């Protein structure tokens, strides 16, 4: 039998959810049930936390649990940040599948997203992180400053486009 859980210990639990929706409590139960928390209540807390900014987007949520209290914080992926920067109207996930986003974002938006993602990137400089975000833009299907993100990546590599150092 596993050792008894210490309630004063800080435990981080990561859950992938759709913003603004109360996920199935049955999917949360195996992760947070042993910590002495109610999956239904945590599901409602997650829905409340993600309802405003991340409605309809798939985001990772970090639950920090200590003394049977859960603190909810959103850990957005690069794709979620890019889709949010597109400012597209919310779509019903159940009706439309495999959405290709055909919007445009500016290079400044990409640099801002890169600054947010810098701590999770393996790149040494900001230019490398910007290239990673541009690759995400290719996957999402949007253009940057009216150009294909692949072309912009090549221009950064050639030195035609300047990226700030920090």
Swiss-Prot record:
Pfam families: Ribosomal_L11, Ribosomal_L11_N. PANTHER family: 60S RIBOSOMAL PROTEIN L12, LARGE RIBOSOMAL SUBUNIT PROTEIN UL11X. This is Large ribosomal subunit protein uL11. It comes from Prunus armeniaca (Apricot). GO terms for molecular function: large ribosomal subunit rRNA binding; structural constituent of ribosome. GO terms for biological process: translation. Keywords: Ribonucleoprotein, Ribosomal protein, RNA-binding, rRNA-binding. Belongs to the universal ribosomal protein uL11 family. The keyword Ribonucleoprotein applies. This protein binds directly to 26S ribosomal RNA. GO terms for cellular component: cytosolic large ribosomal subunit. The keyword Nucleotide-binding does not apply. InterPro entries: Ribosomal_uL11 (IPR000911), Ribosomal_uL11_C (IPR020783), Ribosomal_uL11_C_sf (IPR036769), Ribosomal_uL11_N (IPR020784), Ribosomal_uL11_N_sf (IPR036796).
